[in-house]
Amino acid sequence: MEFYNFKKKLEEKETYKDNMIDNLKKLETYLNSELSVKIQNSLIENNELLIEVDQKDLVQVIQFLKSDDKCKFRQLIDIAGVDYPSDENRFELVYLFLSHENNSRIKLSTKFKINQIINSITKIFPSANWMEREVFDMYGIKF
């Protein structure tokens, strides 16, 4: 009977995590080069890449993330709304995407003022319909 080698498994896990971080850094560099005028900020946190875009560029960036051969973020996981009552740009939407092909996740966020209408992404991700309605119900954000 072979004993479970915990040290070896731990080393494999660390190697996997290092590879994942390296891939996220490459993706971050790629996105910043391809979408340089559209990305306001990007950072890697909790093994996920977060990019911030202006709400006017939201649909174009999401279409790129889904259709680009190096990205392949073809699954929308969720849309979350955030309310910052004291900020000028009071609301933030955070879109969570998954690429099965690349085994990676990305968060895309956009901030905007109260009463701004945000472009819907239901033509790109039909499943966004339900999520956008939930955001409207909770925050009054219109799409």
What do the PLM-derived regions correspond to, one by one?
Residues 1-143:
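Terminal low-complexity/charged segments
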